[in-house]
Amino acid sequence: MTARYLRLQEVQVELAVDDVFLRQVCDEGLVEIKHTVDDEAVISVDDAERLRVITVLMREMDVNLAGAEVILHLRDDVSAMQRQFDEILRALVEELRRRIGGPTR
């Protein structure tokens, strides 16, 4: 799957994020800024969403950057566990269908 990218300047305006804050977030490895062949700064849609979550946590919930980092990692872990659970459940359903002779996908 190909990642979609947004212009960094537009994301910064939308989220009211300044260059200093963005640099801090990038230095912590929470988001990654890339550059096009025309040297335009872009950010992936996923990283733009991560940046939005960070700004909400920090502005509205008074969480510091280190706390936001922990929350993002926990959020990623929960998402990974959910995907694993879904895969296990799918495999279990397929096995049950196979054993009882039901239709499979």
Model-inferred region functions:
Residues 2-9, 13, 23, 27-28, ...:
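Arg/Lys-rich, alpha-helical DNA-contact motif
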